[in-house]
Amino acid sequence: MRIVSSLDEQFRLLHGRSVALLGAVPADRLYWQPRPLTGLYPAHSCGEHILRSAAAVEQTFGGINSNLWDDPFEWTLPEQLPTPSHVENYLAEAEQTRARSFGLFRSDSDLLKEIAVPSGDPRPLLDLVLETLTRAAHHQGRAFATFRLFSEARLPGL
């Protein structure tokens, strides 16, 4: 189970970094926009990227757990999660959903099993898990970059 354990660790680290970053962001800067949301290339806030990272995890592992591939977009809007404590609760929910999936993996070979996804084409679990880790880390990186636009603070343990 070396691959499963390694992936589990990477997702736990991802979650820990998001929680640490959230703790470093002043509440009044959580949804601060680096520039107006006009044009083709919106610049999202630190909080929005933290949420998008967790939402990627929730959507994939919610799909694996219960075959519900709902996009968490509507319940991860800033209006729905207006404070850092609301966001932290959502991060914990997404992490619990992910951990539940990893608890079902009994061996590395489980990651080779295929699962039906919304597109209709079956995909190996390993592909979905790696794609999700990449997408979630991408949004987390963007959250860190946005944080750097308004803060010089050193993030603890990062």
What is each residue range found by the language model?
Residues S18-L21, A94:
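Amphipathic alpha-helical packing segments from all-alpha helical-bundle domains
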Residues P78-V117, R123-Q140:
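Acidic/histidine-rich alpha-helical segments that form the ligand environment
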Residues L22-P26:
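Long, well-ordered alpha-helical segments
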Residues M1, V19, S109-L111:
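A generic, residue-level signal for flexible/boundary positions that often mark functional hotspots
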Residues D8, R12, G16-V19, R29-T76, ...:
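Short, contiguous alpha-helical
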Residues M1-D8, P84-E88:
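Active-site rim elements
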